Amino acid sequence: MAQARENVSLFFKLYCLAVMTLVAAAYTVALRYTRTTAKELYFSTTAVCVTEVIKLLISVGLLAKETGSLGRFKASLSENVLGSPKELMKLSVPSLVYAVQNNMAFLALSNLDAAVYQVTYQLKIPCTALCTVLMLNRTLSKLQWVSVFMLCGGVILVQWKPAQATKVVVEQSPLLGFGAIAIAVLCSGFAGVYFEKVLKSSDTSLWVRNIQMYLSGIVVTLVGTYLSDGAEIKEKGFFYGYTYYVWFVIFLASVGGLYTSVVVKYTDNIMKGFSAAAAIVLSTIASVMLFGLQITLSFAMGALLVCISIYLYGLPRQDTTCIQQEATSKERVIGV
């Protein structure tokens, strides 16, 4: 298996993680604003689809800049996109798996209490770590495993909301709910690590890989848009309810998605999870200032756990951002 050998500085990795965290936090706050203040609510499915298109266009532009000339740009597209249906199929896997994950998450939330859902869904964090170990032949120290589960607990506390009594009786199937959440958790871990493995297992340009994935992502989101809101979109229009704020949210989602791929390429999915947790804490603090959200004891404790877990995971350790070679490929001393 080939191995990508980009040498990037620690500063660049920290920069990408910091930008991804800040963009994700800003995106959460902006998204909340557009979904709670708009009189004419836009279709979230169309926003996701437009985001995929914008990420594709930006990736095409960055590939053109990377290749340096129109001829090399056309040759790269022809060789890696138009002439590589196998590679396109390979990169369609994450898009399809994420689509399954989103549907399973919705099914789980429909059959479980919100509090139970919040707790069980955070198992995607240790599941991602497990997939990293199994699929990429990496090893995590005991302290790293402790920090991963500590992060899981911290996110649960940060997002914890006490259960509220309701007069509406909804028929639920806990068994179906737990089954759906298990599939969603596995899909989350597998899709992220699969994409990381594809990125790091060859010297193919990151922007080529993004183009391959976003092409399939556009198809998947278009199908989802049609199935979810097709009738209403036909009546009201694809861009119904769009404002400058909605376009700003789409811009943040696009930039965040691109930085996520860079983070996965040059660090790993576990670090991406830590960044996402930090973004949750930052967005909640921002919501306190902007929307008057009340800080709870569980949030304070959870935020503390998140910070401690990030510190523990970042302690000096063996580098886990590159795919490890199999034991049989290690250097051996040959006696003559």
Curated annotation (Swiss-Prot):
Key word Transmembrane helix present: yes
Annotated TM spans: 10-30, 46-64, 88-108, 115-135, 142-160, 176-196, 210-228, 244-262, 270-288, 297-315
Question: Which parts of the chain does the record assign to the membrane side Cytoplasmic?
Answer: 1-9, 65-87, 136-141, 197-209, 263-269, 316-336
**Where does the source fall among the domains of life?**
Eukaryota
Subcellular location(s) per record: Golgi apparatus membrane
Q: Name one GO molecular function term.
A: antiporter activity
Q: How does it sit in the membrane?
A: Multi-pass membrane protein
Describe its partners and assembly state. Monomer.
Q: What does this protein do?
A: Transports CMP-sialic acid from the cytosol into the Golgi apparatus, functioning as an antiporter that exchanges CMP-sialic acid for CMP. Binds both CMP-sialic acid and free CMP, but has higher affinity for free CMP. Also able to exchange CMP-sialic acid for AMP and UMP. Also mediates the transport of CDP-ribitol.
Name of the protein: CMP-sialic acid transporter
Species this chain originates from:
Cricetulus griseus
